[in-house]
Amino acid sequence: GWKDWLNKGKEWLKKKGPGIMKAALKAATQ
C-alpha cells in the first residue's frame, strides 16, 4: 500500500538525504 511506499521513501531519504544536500550545496556555491 501507499504507507509502505511512504516508509520506503523515508528510509531512502535518511540514507540519501545528506548526500543530496551536500551535492546541492556544492552546485549552489559554484
Curated annotation (Swiss-Prot):
One GO cellular component, as annotated: extracellular region
GO MF annotation terms: toxin activity
Localization (cell): Secreted
Highest taxon of the lineage: Eukaryota
Entry's Gene Ontology BP terms: defense response to bacterium; defense response to fungus; killing of cells of another organism
Family assignment from sequence similarity: Belongs to the ponericin-G family.
Function field: Shows a broad spectrum of activity against both Gram-positive and Gram-negative bacteria. Also has antimicrobial activity against S.cerevisiae. Has insecticidal and non-hemolytic activity.
Protein name, UniProt field: M-poneritoxin-Ng3c
Source organism (scientific name): Neoponera goeldii (Ponerine ant)
